[in-house]
Amino acid sequence: MLFRSTEYVYTPDSNQNYWTQLFLSLGVDVVIGTHPHVLEPVEVVSDTKGHEMLVYYSLGNFVSNQDQKPRMIGGMAKMTLVKDETGCYVKNYNLTPVITQKLFGQKAITTYKLSDYTESLASGNAIRNDSGCSDFSLSYCQTLVKQILGDDYDESTSELNVSLHPDGLVKDTSATESSSSAK
C-alpha cells in the first residue's frame, strides 16, 4: 500500500502517476493506493515490454467520521493470485464498494457493502446533518461509484469484477517452484 496523493480528488494526480510509472518500470505487479479519502479508479497499466501492473489508485475510506458525502464511500480490494509452472500472475480482480453509516445521536459508525445499502439506511445516515450533505442518498452513492470505476463496474451487482485473459496478467516468470509470491 502506498501513495501520498491529493486528498478528495477522484482521479490520480501527477504524484500517483510518477510512482505508478516507477513501480511499473521496476517490475512491480500490484499497487494498492491509499490516502485521498475518496475512491479512485482501478486499472491495469503496461509498459512497452508488455509487463502489466494492476493499480488500485485509492480505496477511499473504509470507515470515516469525516463530514462530506464522497468520503463515506470506499472499497474493498480483492484479487486472485496464481502461481503455476509458468510463474505468478493476477487471474482476476475485484472492488466491492462500501458505505460508512454514521448513526444519528450516537457515536457509532459501521460499514455496509453498497450492494446491501438501502435508501432507508441512506436517509438515516448522520452525514445528512453535515453542511451540504442533506441530499446524501443511495442514488448519490451508486452514481459516484459508477462515475469513478467506469464501464467495468456492474451496477446490478454493485461490484467491479474483471477476469483477465486465460494466462492472467502480471506474469512473473522469474518465480521458481521454491519462490512463490508475486511482487
Give short role names for the model-derived ranges:
Residues 7-8:
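Active-site-proximal loop/hinge segments that shape catalytic or ion-binding/gating pockets
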Residues 14-75:
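Conserved beta-sheet core of the metallophosphoesterase superfamily
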Residues 69-183:
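A short C-terminal boundary segment appended to hydrolase-like catalytic domains
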